[in-house]
Swiss-Prot record:
Its EC number is 1.14.13.9. It catalyses: L-kynurenine + NADPH + O2 + H(+) = 3-hydroxy-L-kynurenine + NADP(+) + H2O. The gene is kh. This is Kynurenine 3-monooxygenase. The lineage of its organism: Eukaryota, Metazoa, Ecdysozoa, Arthropoda, Hexapoda. It is an enzyme of class 1 (oxidoreductase). GO terms for cellular component: mitochondrial outer membrane. Belongs to the aromatic-ring hydroxylase family. KMO subfamily. Optimum temperature is 40 degrees Celsius.
Amino acid sequence: MTAQYKQTNTNGLTARNLNVAVVGGGLVGSLFALHLGKKGHTVDLYEYREDIRTAELVIGRSINLALSARGRKALAEVGLEDALLQHGIPMKGRMLHDLKGNRKIVPYDANTNQCIYSVGRKHLNEVLLDAAEKYPNIHLYFNKKLQSANLDEGEMSFIDPTTKESTHTKADLIVGCDGAYSAVRKEIVKRPGYDYSQTYIEHGYLELCIPPTKDGDFAMPHNYLHIWPRGKFMMIALPNQDRTWTVTLFMPFTNFNSIKCDGDLLKFFRTYFPDAIDLIGRERLVKDFFKTRPQSLVMIKCKPYNVGGKAVIIGDAAHAMVPFYGQGMNAGFEDCTVLTELFNQHGSDVDRILAEFSDTRWEDAHSICDLAMYNYVEMRDLVTKRSYLFRKKLDELLYWMLPNTWVPLYNSVSFSHMRYSKCIANRKWQDKILTRVLYCCSITAVAAAGYFGYKYGNMDLVQHYSSSVLQLLKLK
């Protein structure tokens, strides 16, 4: 079907409409189809699973996700931000659970009270597909698994996993949004000079559920991301619209493998998550834990993302990451924003658009992959340490005093559109400043102690104090 919309770029020049094949009808694929459809391109979207809107259960994917500023911007550009925020549940900070069941609140942003939103994956995907279906120039095809592709020619072969029927098609542009195990990326990897790395971590995850109370309400304060940090492993819980909680246990596979029976499981939870037993329910805990196997976590980095002006990969296909920064979906949605802005700038020059996207985006994608890996250590271990809490308070104070200069790392990642690579550079700059300040203050303190020790004849105190300060600097 011919597109019904006239496309122009930001320079006011009319750009030709493209026939685009979007491979993958998940969150990123359906959103990018909307971005392209809105610009007037003809879009054929192919998804190898059945239509999620009619599926009773989506296997192997997290039920809910954290939506933050980058994702919100991409949704706003297709007019869906407000509707999804109304469905989402705002989370204004972390609520930490200790071994005794005591809870401590750590706000995300104590100064401006910004928050992230817990949104249902299935609902979000349904909204995106419903919106895409309203465009006459967007066509949705389900149960279409990519078998092979000639990316240089824009040719693809799909097969229906159920009927085994084959479909052959051709497009001006192929966009791979088909996840961490992308079939489109597999075609790109075959090309010489391609950089690719795949890293599995030794930790897996398993999902549980906290039901509503007998009164039908949330079992815990629902405007927080709840975390049970335990050093080498952790458990988290995000609220759902139906008053349930999606609980995810992250820990090494060796720990999972050591739990072989009901008794092992209950002993483990009584030791590390005692308050969660009553929240989940003993019978439900046992049933949910043993009904599925823990899933693996993978990080994928690669470049370039494009094949000339004929194909590009975005989302998890380009940069799959572990889920500990809540940026997987947001980074994928930001890919849509970045590409759309390049289409606005360069019109029909697809070679230039894809080359510029690939050249500039990979560094940011690699940066957020690394940050996500680091944040696992923070969430399961560092959040309980005084040094972490002190640094967070100091960051909040400096952010309050210098809001345009000193932006904490989490704020820059979750509440701004600053490039991910710049977020890391900012953090390194802040660390350097604080190290120098600590050093200068410590030297001044030692000098003052020396002066007063000499004046009052107490050099033992000076030596003890100086030794303590130098040890602090060494730890820093």
